[in-house]
Amino acid sequence: MMISRGLFGWSPPHIQPLTPVSEVSEPPESPSPYLDPGAEHGGTGTAAQADDEEEMEEPEEMEPPPAAVPFSQLFACADRFDWVLMVFGSVAAAAHGTALIVYLHYFAKIVQVLAFPTDSDHLISDDQFNRLLELSLTIVYIAGGVFISGWIEVSCWILTGERQTAVIRSKYVQVLLNQDMSFFDTYGNNGDIVSQVLSDVLLIQSALSEKVGNYIHNMATFISGLIIGFVNCWEIALITLATGPFIVAAGGISNIFLHRLAENIQDAYAEAASIAEQAVSYVRTLYAFTNETLAKYSYATSLQATLRYGILISLVQGLGLGFTYGLAICSCAMQLWIGRFFVIHHRANGGEIITALFAVILSGLGLNQAATNFYSFDQGRIAAYRLFEMISRSSSGTNQEGIILSAVQGNIEFRNVYFSYLSRPEIPILSGFYLTVPAKKAVALVGRNGSGKSSIIPLMERFYDPTLGEVLLDGENIKNLKLEWLRSQIGLVTQEPALLSLSIRENIAYGRDATLDQIEEAAKKAHAHTFISSLEKGYETQVGKTGLTLTEEQKIKLSIARAVLLDPTILLLDEVTGGLDFEAERVVQEALDLLMLGRSTIIIARRLSLIRNADYIAVMEEGQLLEMGTHDELINLGNLYAELLKCEEATKLPRRMPVRNYNDSAAFQAERDSSAGRGFQEPSSPKMAKSPSLQRGHNVFRSQELCFNSEESPNDHSPAPEKLGENGSSLDVGEKEPTIKRQDSFEMRLPELPKIDIQCPQRQKSNGSDPESPISPLLISDPQNERSHSQTFSRPLGHSDDTSASVKVAKDGQHKEPPSFWRLAQLSFPEWLYAVLGSIGAAIFGSFNPLLAYVIALVVTTYYTSKGSHLREEVDKWCLIIACMGIVTVVANFLQHFYFGIMGEKMTERVRRMMFSAMLRNEVGWYDEEENSPDTLSMRLANDATFVRAAFSNRLSIFIQDSFAVIVAILIGLLLGWRLALVALATLPVLTLSAIAQKLWLAGFSKGIQEMHRKASLVLEDAVRNIYTVVAFCAGNKVMELYRLQLQRILRQSFFHGMAIGFAFGFSQFLLFACNALLLWYTALSVDRRYMKLSTALTEYMVFSFATFALVEPFGLAPYILKRRRSLASVFEIIDRVPTIEPDDTSALSPPNVYGSIELKNIDFCYPTRPEVLVLSNFSLKVNGGQTVAVVGVSGSGKSTIISLIERYYDPVAGQVLLDGRDLKSYNLRWLRSHMGLIQQEPIIFSTTIRENIIYARHNASEAEMKEAARIANAHHFISSLPHGYDTHIGMRGVELTQGQKQRIAIARVVLKNAPILLIDEASSSIESESSRVVQEALDTLIMGNKTTILIAHRVAMMRHVDNIVVLNGGKIVEEGTHDCLAGKNGLYVRLMQPHFGKNLRRHQLI
């Protein structure tokens, strides 16, 4: 019967712990750069901070409740049709809610048939038979009413909810796009505000549609249940009400603890989530420093913090559910026991007692379910307050009705302007600023960081208004001008152009109507037409967040085309070419030069070399105009501009290279001859000196300059190979020179972790150094521990490529099918004892469902078939049995939920560790795939592991419980009457469909179209992220048009969606009642045909009615399990994936010595995500040990790819990358990367202390070594100036550092690593000139450290200490040689470096 869940199916909300029990050993000796040091009080700096925080603690004040609108205000956007829908929906919900109570009323009449007189010749009289048929037909009528009311209820509330929230969304977006820029400065324009709006609207929609209907439905059940209960037997109803608070208290107390524990466990897992997110986000850095084991340990250790919470949740859940069910069953036994007094004294019959009892129980459950909606109502009211407050907010105070100038000359004047941002009013940006821009002239604004130059463009665009002063256009204050007209006269091009998720055509024409011919003409002027035409869909190619990814150069060209199409009088350029390489910068500058002709132009520049041709240069300092004039005039003045230019030029002009200081040439010749005797030539680099000191002197040997073109190569020989053992050690027993001083293996000191088996050879240590050396001993080899020039290695064996190929064939081939049940069971096998104990509890509790129904049915039949003392004895016996079952239920629930909970927690933890460990074994190419983005992987770690738990431990618990319920119910049915049992079983498929449909409905009305809302929100998110572009090009109406179009599609879809969901839900409820009517009809038929007695038949009918949900639920779980099986498949695809580049091959080589010779031989390469684009083609490059080679080239020529191949982030498609004559594939991957130091263009800083960021390279480094590394990196001074020094927390939760400071910390990390091979990837390209100089000095010192160095550069500053320069174009070497040689060729190298040297490039010689 449908009331069975009313007695046994309700429980406090089930809260699944996010993080499980961990089984990790002792922590490492050194702190992890992933873990928050605030969590451990071992550091003095951290402890001091903690003490300060304790002193600052004040008594907590209770926060006032958040503001909320009145409930009626939720429907403020409803029109007349919405009110009609809500009225019909409410009536239908009330009718649907009373249906179960009405059925219960007729159930009493079914039981009352037992009181009819029977025919002596028949087991059932004609009156009884006809009455049962009549009642079964009545239940069919109820089923029809439920079908109609359920359909109308769901459909009406879905439709009205979508309609009302569509109006709210539209009004909100309209107001949002009309806000001034100070609003976005305050609340952010990074898309978070859109996500908040989307979630707020969903809360409102849930509150005013789904939850209102659900509330009316359950309140109707509550009211009708009380009425029916008191009408049938008010005494029983009253007593049942009196016991209700005790049952509610048991569940409520456990809920309070569960919610608190849930919050604690969320906070505990946040630390682990942060570790995982940083690890997968910065995986290249993590791999480069071979810290995979540390990351795994840190992640596992952070999961340890959730151990006690997981156990407590399982404990509280088991006890809470046990006492709730136990008290409910004992209460039922008491009501039935009291009922016998009313039956004996003829004050009520059995049907009235059972109806009163269950009607009040259902009434209480209805009230409980109705009360759960109040939380949603409160959330909806709070969300509505936030949205309605925004909707009622006045739009931008700017003038929309101003004047329009008849003709625009373009004279611009800033007159005594004072300005500060509203979000930071205490910080003055401009203070008495004056500036005049003559018509059709270009004025460049320069100055130090924080001088205020970047605020000029938003003031000119009227994103903001000055605090004091005025901005004039042709003598008219721009406040008096019509805003839309003003912005139509201004073209804006920025360094980071905004592209929206539209086609290229729509992006160029953004905010205005234009023909395709006009768009193409604008693209041609912007030098964009060629690359657009080469795309498959041309101008219809989708770009932006959801479309094709374009290069920065291409984005800027589209931005220029957009400005060209606007044909503005005034042009604003904000550091347009700052992030481009030389060739891209030249092309873009040509397009800008054309665009600037005949227009008043303001240029914001940070690189002074780009603005020498401006008509005037204005120099700003602290918000004021310091000086203004032409380039030559300002140079002659010799003030700030000259100083800034001098700083920039200092980073460009090549310096003399450091060379060895020999007392006489004979000494050098002797060493050269000695070297030749060992089978190799002296490398061209003068830094290959074996002297521990690199001193400058007067007697300098300068090697002959070499120059090669694309068809030539240096005449260098590879070092002679030597014979090696299988482990990479030399078979030569002669004298061996020790290796460079290296770090001790931190991994060797970590406790053993399950599924983490990483072995690392113990490396030798050395502490010798020359105190006389001007170069730190951290940068050079130990004099007693030099790299051996003679101990080199032969090429790899031929079969290594075959092995790699076989791995690639197997790539991602596992688990196309979901994992088997046995695979899941294997994961939980260590907790088999917990599973056994939990299964015992689940089996006992599941069996009690039909057993309790059977005993209650016996009590009810006893009311009719027994009298006097026999009735009293029988009822007492059965009620005592029910009470005992209630007590056993407490124990059974505790066993079930506590032990299955522990098993699930351990399984979740184990799967998370296995997934994280497997992720960190994959090659970098795996992370490049879209489905393996950091956000996605972090989310999968958080959620997918819980799916494994849900699919096994949770579902196993319910499956065992319901399976025993089914088995016991079938056994009871077969014992009482097998024919009726078979009919009941035949209805199971139909009831299964009903259960599935109902579960889908209970999951929420709105989920079916949430994806459409997400797509609609992308339009708004694009606009908010690029709000400056939207406002500057007056495209708010365009955004509004696109958004409304999406809303119209959603409304059309929601109508059909609502009707379909409503029909499915109504029909599912119809099937539930119709099957019950069928069962009652066959019960009457069975008795009439003398298959069984009437009392026995009705007992079996009641058993199956009570057990209906238990019989159906295992099948109802099918869609959930099938859905989760897809998630499970993805989990095991990660765990079982075989990486194409194996990091843990213990049979690979780990030689004791490294020479440092690197060769890329006949390389063909394309990225796995772009196999159609060949990045390197038949590429060859050789770098001798100790040499420094610079690689330059246009954007996309393959420069950074070289470093990725050397770090073995990727393997080439064809060819070989060799280290000391052996293919990189023959080396152990972690060993290989441990001998390389990598400095990237974007410095990666972990969210921890500066100390831990530096010692990330070598965890056993001493304090002195760490500080020495910081000094070499020019970082010690600024670190020491911070309040907490090296213990300062940086990153997401700490102090914000500049890009230059971050880069210096990254350099210090590489210095501390002291690897023999150094890889630098445009380390100073993204840093402003002033900071770039400091970073450049640190790089210079690092490069002088006697290492094999490959640097990617696009500034001449990086060419100071190079032995060879390689120029790339199209994945091939087109020029090669020294700086002077390449400068003399006047080829691509000259064109690339022209912006940095000017016309006199050839004069600069490397001396």
Curated annotation (Swiss-Prot):
ATP 2 binds at residues 1193-1200. Keywords: ATP-binding, Glycoprotein, Membrane, Nucleotide-binding, Repeat, Transmembrane, Transmembrane helix, Transport. The keyword Transport applies. Residues 18-65, 670-696, 709-815 are annotated as: Disordered. GO terms for molecular function: ABC-type transporter activity; ATP binding; ATP hydrolysis activity. It catalyses: (indol-3-yl)acetate(in) + ATP + H2O = (indol-3-yl)acetate(out) + ADP + phosphate + H(+). Residues 733-755 have a biased composition (Basic and acidic residues). The chain crosses the membrane at residues 84-104, 139-159, 212-231, 236-258, 310-330, 351-371, 840-860, 880-900, 958-978, 982-1002, 1061-1081, 1102-1122. It is a multi-pass membrane protein. Signal peptide: none annotated. PANTHER family: ABC TRANSPORTER B FAMILY, ABC TRANSPORTER B FAMILY MEMBER 20-RELATED. Probable auxin efflux transporter that contributes, together with ABCB20 and in a FKBP42/TWD1-dependent manner, to the regulation of leaf position and morphology, internode distribution, roots development, and inflorescence organization, probably by modulating auxin repartition. This is ABC transporter B family member 6. It comes from Arabidopsis thaliana. The gene is ABCB6.
